[in-house]
């Protein structure tokens, strides 16, 4: 079993810890929580670069090794890093429990060393008709991010 973790932070008080677990070549389980969010849906993605020198802006685009368009997690045509939305309750906390087969922790397309990002707005899953729908899901600003690192 391979485990990884990302500690999310921001200058706006949004913070959280996201855990990644993968058994063999199976799908990766993503669990954890993020606090300090406005209630509602927030885009949740793996971004290509594990670089936070300029905050979350330097994490690059969504992780997309197959050069596909943005989509929903269940879509065949999607970025590998498209994990859909997380929902923050009235308390501003989003509890995360996702399983995905396109974000391995080992091999040539591993997400280790990349970043996980929570966005300000809902991800329209590529179906919103906005000019950004097919690239970012029109999910708005990046409110928190963290680099995905191997865990003991």
Swiss-Prot record:
Keywords: Antioxidant, Copper, Cytoplasm, Disulfide bond, Metal-binding, Oxidoreductase, Zinc. It is found in: Cytoplasm. It is an enzyme of class 1 (oxidoreductase). Transmembrane segments: none annotated. Pfam families: Sod_Cu. GO terms for cellular component: cytoplasm. It comes from the Eukaryota. Binds 1 copper ion per subunit. Binds 1 zinc ion per subunit. Its EC number is 1.15.1.1. GO terms for molecular function: copper ion binding; superoxide dismutase activity. GO terms for biological process: removal of superoxide radicals. Gene3D superfamilies: Superoxide dismutase, copper/zinc binding domain (2.60.40.200). Its cofactor is Cu cation; Zn(2+). It catalyses: 2 superoxide + 2 H(+) = H2O2 + O2. Disulfide bonds join 56-145. Cu cation binds at residues 45, 47, 62, 119. CDD domains: Cu-Zn_Superoxide_Dismutase. SUPFAM superfamilies: Cu,Zn superoxide dismutase-like. Zn(2+) binds at residues 62, 70, 79, 82. Destroys radicals which are normally produced within the cells and which are toxic to biological systems. Homodimer. Belongs to the Cu-Zn superoxide dismutase family. This is Superoxide dismutase [Cu-Zn] 4AP. It comes from Zea mays (Maize). The gene is SODCC.2.
